[in-house]
Structure formats: structure tokens, C-alpha cells
């Protein structure tokens, strides 16, 4: 007999996932079939303190408590009951950054988030030393930059971790990290499912002259993979989450993960030859590889799935913000003439109209650079629209050129994977704001990366659902399936989403667009140099 959602909660068989995003903390409660049955959220913002982006320790715990209180409220309203016991819990958060603690568990400097770019010197030196692309936002870049800057706190370090790792440690007492999140601290060896020992040794030799009382391997969290037990909720941990006191200690907790890994899980993209694209304010693509790349590339970050498979990630700072600004301009026009129109209708109408334009957007070009874009060599950005007098200047082409621009940098990064490394992919699943209007964003992306693109209804549930699925995989995987098979058979069975294949005309049109885009990049560089 099928259990109701209320019975699932009362019998302690629900699973909880909580993810700390950059602007929102979200909690999702799922039933034994992995369906969301309740949720809560809390908005928060980073602060710029002494030139560095951070969230305070107080904001982290207040945010978690507010989010959980909102979840309790939803459970009470829907089912008139309290959450007391759970089958499992999982925590995830934005990856990378730097949280350093001393022997007594005190944080030594304010949490430095992934957004900080003060680590250029360290990242460049480590990339050369490791013969591996080390991005600015990775934890090892932050640590080494602190060393290069002679920061006094470094000698007192006992433990460094990520935001998800910190929360997990505080509520379970375990200094561990899921392999996907760990891969954003320091490179991972997918063969042994642990940090790359050669790189650890190289780092220790590099900093040996400083005579610190620690070795790198002793201050990093222990690496765990999906399905591992990562500890149990302590009484103190339960009180930190649920200020009402209803939540009980002893609940098993899965390895804490990063937002890249939970995004892969939420889109069923952890299997080799699959991938996913997230496209909103910023964008990234992640392709699960069959074999290692032949060499490092500055525009490709190597991370892993939550079960340790190697993943090539292309990250773009800009995606839909400039496009949104143009749509808002059309909304302003509507208001000026007294036209009342819902924003969803405005987006949908303009996006659909864009498909009536030319595949190459009639020669029109847009650079959507609200901020800098490392892949195209820009440390700053200036949103720019460029056309010549002979281009086909129409509304459809104008919107299409901005849609093309939203995935232009993704195209440039992924061309390396497909053209130079000959990476094979069977399925890419897309999620994010760009795909809210059915078919349009999907078609544009399919043409840009020359691959069929699927969109699933559930992908909108995002990372909190992804970490809930990982917690369920640990607690409910009675058949001992691999993570790939568990997701395929227990979660996504029969849900392939809607797939769109790019046409030859669309691919050729986008190729023409991106050729124009690349040849005119000098205009964007000039705009950055001259427009203040």
C-alpha cells in the first residue's frame, strides 16, 4: 500500500536535502519515491568586507535555521505534523572558497567565497607546478595566496574546508567531504578516489621553507563518495538546525557535496558520456568524461561527479543578465503606452519571435559581458550590441542575437572538448532560467554545442533536490546499485524529458554567428579600455 506524505514524515522515512546557494538557501523534503513533499527557503546575500566577498558565521547559521523553520511551516500547513525523525539528511553548498580553522575550531579569517579573485598569483604558480588548470576560486589557490601574502593565521591552521564541509562538521563532528566538493579544493585522482598524492607532495615541498607545523594532507577533509555514511546528527547539530527542538539526533548524514555535483544528480548526468548545462545569471556546462583529457586547458576546470568520475567543466560569468536588461526595456516601453503585460508573457512572446529570425541573427552581434569573462580574455565587461549598416536589423534577429550571445562563451569552451579532445556525449540535460520558455533556449543551446538537449520538469527543483537524492541513495539503496543505476531505475525511470535535436541549418547559422563574434572581440576589448 502506498504511504501518504504525512505517514512518510510521521514514520521518519522522509529524506531532507539542504543547499546553500549564493543568494538562496533551500530545503527539500522527499518521500521514498524521491518526490518533493515539502520545502523551505531563505534569501541571503554575500558582503564585501575588506575587499573580499564573505558570508558571516552568524549569517550561515541564522540562514540555515530560517530555512528549516520555513520548511517546518510548510509541513505544518500541508500535513499538520512536525518533522522529528528522518531517514537521512544531506548538506550541499557553493563550492570552492576558503574556511580555515585552528585547533579549537575557531575560524581564523572570515570565510572567503568562490567569488574572490585575489588569488591570481597563486593559481598561476600552482597550475604551472601541478601541470593542471587550478582556477582562482579553488581552495588550494586561496591557501597558497595566504602563504604568498605572509598572512599570520596560516601557521595556526588545523583544518580547511568548504561551506558544505563546515556545516556537516558542525552538525556531525565529522571532518569529511564528498568527492565532488573535494575536487574543487584540490585535484582528485579518480582512480583512487582521493586527493592526487603527487600534487599534495609537490605542494608540501613548495611551502617547506615556511616551516609550518602542518602538512597539506593533515589539514584537508577526508574524501568520501556517494553512498558512504558520513556520520550522524549530534544533539548539538540537531539544535543548530531546528531551534524548536523537534528534530532528533542520530539521523544518518550523507557526504556533504558541492553545487556542481548536486546539479549533476538533479539532471541525471553522472554517467559517462552525459552532461548538463545550467544557464541563468551565469552558466556552466559539465561533461562526464570516458578518459582523461590529453592536456590541461585554462578554460576547462576538472572536477568529479559525486561518485568520482572525471568531469570537464566550462564556467562562464555571464549568461542572461544583459538579455534580461533588454527585456526590461521592452517592459518599460509597454508601460509608457499603457500596455499591461505579464513578464512571463513578454519573455515568451519575444523568445518565440526570435526563432523566426535568421539562425546567424542576420549578422547582429551582442556581447553580454556584465562582468569580465576569462574564457575570452576579459577581466572586465561592457555589455555591447554591434551591427553594420548592411545587417538584417529586425526584432527577431535582435532578440536572437542576444539569445545566441547568452551561450556564445559556452560554445567557445566546449569546442575544445568536442573538436580538439573528441569527447563523445550521448545526452545533455539543461536547466535554469534560459529554458523557462519551452523550446527556445533549448534550440539555441543545441545549435551552439551541436548536441541534442533535453529539459526535464524536475530539473527546476535544483541542488537541494540533488543532495536529498544523494542522502536517499545512502539510506535507501537496498539493491546496492551504482549511483548511475540508482538514478536511472529508482528516480528518473520513464522521465527522459523533452529532447530537441539541432538542425543542420541551425548549427551552420550559429557557427556563422560565433565566427563574427570572435572576429569582433577587439571591439569589446576597446569598450572595456575606453568606457568608464
Feature locations, PLM:
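Active-site core segments that coordinate phosphate-bearing ligands/cofactors
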Residues: 2-10, 16-17, 83, 124-137, ...
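Carbohydrate-associated surface elements
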Residues: 116
Amino acid at each position: 500500500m502506498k504511504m501518504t506524505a504525512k505517514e512518510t514524515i510521521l514514520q521518519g522515512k522522509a529524506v531532507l536535502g539542504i543547499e546553500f546557494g549564493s543568494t538562496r538557501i533551500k530545503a527539500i523534503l522527499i518521500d521514498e519515491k524521491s518526490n518533493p513533499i515539502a520545502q523551505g527557503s531563505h534569501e541571503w546575500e554575500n558582503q564585501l568586507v575588506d575587499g573580499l566577498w564573505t558570508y558571516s558565521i552568524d549569517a550561515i547559521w541564522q540562514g540555515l535555521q530560517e530555512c528549516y523553520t520555513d520548511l517546518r511551516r510548510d509541513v505544518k500547513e500541508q500535513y499538520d505534523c512536525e518533522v522529528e525523525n528522518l531517514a537521512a539528511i544531506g548538506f550541499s553548498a557553493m563550492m570552492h572558497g576558503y574556511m580555515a580553522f585552528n585547533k579549537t575550531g575557531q575560524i581564523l579569517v572570515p570565510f572567503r567565497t568562490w567569488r574572490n579573485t585575489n588569488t591570481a598569483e597563486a593559481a598561476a604558480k600552482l597550475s604551472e607546478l601541478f601541470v593542471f588548470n587550478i582556477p582562482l576560486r579553488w581552495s588550494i589557490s586561496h591557501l597558497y595566496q595566504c602563504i604568498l601574502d605572509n598572512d599570520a593565521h596560516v601557521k595556526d591552521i588545523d583544518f580547511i574546508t568548504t561551506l558544505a564541509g563546515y556545516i556537516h562538521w558542525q552538525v556531525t563532528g565529522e571532518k569529511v567531504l564528498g568527492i565532488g566538493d573535494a575536487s574543487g579544493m584540490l585535484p582528485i585522482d579518480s582512480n583512487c578516489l582521493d586527493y592526487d598524492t603527487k600534487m599534495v607532495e609537490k605542494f608540501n615541498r613548495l611551502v617547506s621553507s615556511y616551516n609550518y607545523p602542518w602538512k597539506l594532507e593533515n589539514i584537508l577533509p577526508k574524501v568520501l563518495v556517494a553512498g558512504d555514511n558520513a556520520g550522524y546528527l549530534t544533539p548539538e547539530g540537531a539544535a543548530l538546525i531546528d531551534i524548536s527542538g523537534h528534530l532528533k539526533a542520530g539521523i544518518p548524514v550523507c557526504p556533504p557535496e558541492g553545487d556542481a555535483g548536486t546539479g549533476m544528480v538533479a539532471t541525471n548526468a553522472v554517467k559517462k558520456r552525459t552532461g548538463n548545462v545550467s544557464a541563468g545569471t551565469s552558466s556552466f556546462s559539465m561533461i562526464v568524461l570516458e578518459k582523461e583529457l590529453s592536456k590541461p586547458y585554462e578554460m576547462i576546470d576538472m572536477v568529479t561527479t559525486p561518485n568520482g568520475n572525471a568531469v570537464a567543466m566550462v564556467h562562464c560569468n555571464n549568461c542572461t543578465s544583459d538579455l534580461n536588461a533588454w527585456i526590461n526595456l521592452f517592459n518599460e516601453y509597454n508601460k509608457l503606452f499603457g500596455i499591461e503585460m505579464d513578464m512571463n508573457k513578454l519573455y515568451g512572446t519575444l523568445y518565440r519571435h526570435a526563432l523566426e529570425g535568421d539562425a546567424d541573427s542576420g549578422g547582429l552581434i551582442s556581447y553580454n559581458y556584465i562582468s569580465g569573462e576569462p574564457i575570452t580574455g576579459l577581466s572586465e565587461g561592457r555589455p555591447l550590441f554591434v551591427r553594420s549598416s548592411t545587417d538584417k536589423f529586425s526584432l527577431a534577429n535582435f532578440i536572437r542575437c542576444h539569445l545566441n550571445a547568452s551561450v556564445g562563451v559556452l560554445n567557445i569552451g566546449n569546442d575544445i572538448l568536442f573538436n580538439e579532445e573528441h569527447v563523445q556525449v550521448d545526452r545533455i540535460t539543461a536547466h535554469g532560467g534560459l529554458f523557462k520558455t519551452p523550446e527556445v533556449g533549448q534550440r539555441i543551446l543545441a545549435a551552439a554545442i551541436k548536441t541534442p538537449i533535453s529539459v526535464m520538469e524536475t530539473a527546476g527543483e535544483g541542488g537541494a533536490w540533488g543532495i536529498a537524492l544523494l542522502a536517499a541513495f545512502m539510506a535507501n539503496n537496498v539493491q546496492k546499485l551504482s549511483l548511475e543505476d540508482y538514478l536511472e531505475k529508482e528516480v528518473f525511470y520513464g522521465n527522459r524529458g523533452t529532447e530537441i535535436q539541432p538542425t543542420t541549418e541551425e548549427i551552420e547559422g550559429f557557427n556563422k554567428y560565433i565566427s563574427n563574434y570572435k572576429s569582433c572581440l577587439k571591439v569589446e576589448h576597446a569598450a572595456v579600455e575606453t568606457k568608464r
